């Protein structure tokens, strides 16, 4: 019988161990304790971070939102029907990231950045964190460049600047989305990249928005992030942050971007749903205590950053350029109640609001902008010179008209001055009306405002103000194209432009019909 040498045995074992090809991974692993309504409770994940991605079997991911003493509450990103009690859950050591870059322009993606438009994969894109800290005070620059929405009522009375947060607020079906979409359409030649985030909307509505942007040639410089009503609350909650990260890509590289959140009321509802399922204590209107922070940390990321910030971020690749991300958040009110919890929160966070009123909309004044309640806190410094010069009396005329119209209902006879003021107010109200998907250029807008400001509408019938304006703009674009081009390029207002407009309108009124 052959004798085995103990040293040989150890050599054989050692050789086998050396040849064994095993890649070991040190991972924090836990067990799923319960699964319900998209919320998973996990036991045993001791080292998990807040907001960390958690991997489940079958390539399903979750996000840790509740870190408790003996368990972790996570929200599942996507379908949770394949998960069951007893399954393993692993920490990934990563926080949620989404694709960013110019490859996303013209595409429709979900809240995680996956394309959903059937146009194939995105290609090689960078990724960036969904949750980021807003630029500090030192890196910011004041707002002094305009974002033209193409609406007279907005650009004349409630101007929006690059890097501003301007809230669009009003009841349902009143033209909030229409205003935001027109603002995006108006950017197709302005060099501003756009991001449209649809939260909790019908898929047919999102498809309609995509079609309209495509028809108007604005889809090529727009990213659409869609978290429709059929998506889980987790994705509806994350969509605005994902869209913001995509917009910040342009801001941080010295470009200008515009982001529309449509709408943040539905994001707050989705977050409330998640919080209640995670058993967090409810507060006012059953919203969790941090619902203000939900919106403030999102909207603070919209800003205008300095040349130094862009240079530092790009490691000197881009110099001498400021970047901006302008936000147009939308909030839906119930029966015009702006004092509800979420509307008051967002009003206090933003730099002004455009208030759309049901009564005006129903009486045919569209866009239904209530100039009295609407305000732009920083946009005045960014307004185009010619619009600023000519729009001074418009807001006053409308405010006085509304005040006098209320008194005129009770007065039997009015003096001449009051009657003139009322008629001027009616004409200005007519002039502020504008068709959907027809944003105006600076020159067209300036011409309309000039006609109102300098009294050229006084002898025009109130019912014919709209047709007068259309005919006047068509006449100037045909016979005074050079003057209009000059206004569009420079946006200045001087004696030559004043004289040119005056002479042109006088000739138009003498020779043309409308």
From Swiss-Prot:
At the top of the EC hierarchy, this enzyme's class is translocase
- Is Hydrolase included in the keywords of this UniProt record? no
- Give me the residues that bind ATP, please: 170-177
Where it sits in the cell: the answer is: Cell inner membrane
The protein's matches in Gene3D superfamilies, at most eight in alphabetical order, are given as: 2.40.30.20, ATP synthase alpha/beta chain, C-terminal domain, P-loop containing nucleotide triphosphate hydrolases
Bilayer disposition of the protein: Peripheral membrane protein
Q: Which GO terms describe its cellular component?
A: plasma membrane; proton-transporting ATP synthase complex
Name the EC number(s): 7.1.2.2
Q: According to UniProt, where does the site described as Required for activity lie?
A: 374
Say yes or no: keyword Cytoplasm present. no
User: What does the subunit comment say?
Assistant: F-type ATPases have 2 components, CF(1) - the catalytic core - and CF(0) - the membrane proton channel. CF(1) has five subunits: alpha(3), beta(3), gamma(1), delta(1), epsilon(1). CF(0) has three main subunits: a(1), b(2) and c(9-12). The alpha and beta chains form an alternating ring which encloses part of the gamma chain. CF(1) is attached to CF(0) by a central stalk formed by the gamma and epsilon chains, while a peripheral stalk is formed by the delta and b chains.
Q: What does this protein do?
A: Produces ATP from ADP in the presence of a proton gradient across the membrane. The alpha chain is a regulatory subunit.
Quote the protein name from its UniProt record. Answer: ATP synthase subunit alpha
- Organism (species): Pseudomonas fluorescens (strain SBW25)
């Amino acid at each position: 019988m052959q004798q085995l040498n103990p040293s040989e045995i150890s050599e054989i074992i050692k050789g086998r161990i050396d040849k064994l090809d095993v890649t070991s991974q040190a991972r924090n692993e836990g067990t799923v304790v319960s699964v319900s309504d998209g919320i998973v409770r996990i036991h045993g994940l001791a080292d998990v971070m807040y907001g960390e991605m958690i991997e489940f079997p079958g390539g399903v991911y979750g996000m840790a939102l509740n870190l408790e003493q003996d368990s972790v509450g996570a929200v599942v990103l996507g379908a949770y029907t394949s998960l069951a009690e007893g399954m393993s859950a692993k920490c990934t050591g990563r926080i949620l990231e989404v694709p960013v870059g110019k490859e996303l322009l013209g595409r429709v993606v979900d809240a995680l950045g996956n394309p959903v438009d059937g146009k194939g994969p995105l290609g090689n894109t960078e990724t960036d964190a969904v949750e980021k800290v807003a630029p500090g005070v030192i890196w910011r620059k004041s707002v002094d460049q305009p974002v033209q929405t193409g609406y007279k009522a907005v650009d004349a009375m409630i101007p929006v600047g690059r890097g501003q947060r301007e809230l669009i607020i009003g009841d349902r079906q009143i033209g909030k989305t229409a205003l935001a979409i027109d603002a995006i359409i108006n950017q197709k030649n302005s060099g501003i990249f756009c991001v449209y985030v649809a939260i909790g909307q019908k898929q047919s509505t999102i498809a309609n928005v995509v079609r309209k942007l495509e028809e108007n040639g604005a889809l090529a410089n727009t990213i659409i992030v869609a978290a429709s009503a059929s998506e889980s609350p987790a994705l509806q909650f994350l969509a605005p942050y994902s869209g913001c990260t995509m917009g910040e890509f342009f801001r941080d590289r010295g470009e200008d971007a515009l982001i529309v959140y449509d709408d943040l009321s539905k994001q707050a509802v989705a977050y409330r749903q998640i919080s209640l399922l995670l058993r967090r204590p409810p507060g006012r209107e059953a919203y969790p205590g941090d619902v203000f922070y939900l919106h403030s940390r999102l909207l603070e990321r919209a800003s205008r950053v300095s040349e130094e910030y862009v240079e530092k971020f790009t490691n000197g690749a881009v110099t001498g350029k400021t970047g901006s991300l302008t936000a147009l958040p939308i909030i839906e009110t119930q029966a015009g109640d702006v004092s509800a919890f979420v509307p008051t929160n967002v009003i206090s966070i933003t730099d002004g609001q455009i208030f759309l009123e049901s009564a005006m909309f129903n009486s045919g004044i569209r866009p239904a902008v209530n100039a009295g309640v609407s305000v732009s806190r920083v946009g005045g410094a960014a307004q185009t010179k010619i619009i600023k010069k000519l729009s001074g009396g418009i807001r006053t005329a409308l405010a006085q008209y509304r005040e006098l119209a209320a008194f005129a209902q009770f007065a039997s006879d009015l003096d001449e001055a009051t009657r003139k003021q009322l008629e001027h107010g009616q004409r200005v109200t007519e002039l502020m009306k504008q068709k959907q998907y027809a944003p105006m250029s600076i020159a067209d807008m300036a011409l309309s405002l000039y006609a109102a400001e300098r009294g050229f509408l006084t002898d025009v019938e109130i019912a014919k103000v709209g047709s007068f304006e259309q005919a006047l703009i068509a006449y100037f674009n045909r016979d005074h194209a050079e003057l209009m081009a000059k206004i569009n390029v420079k946006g200045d207002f001087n004696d030559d432009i004043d004289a040119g407009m005056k002479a042109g309108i006088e000739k138009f009124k003498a020779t043309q019909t409308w």
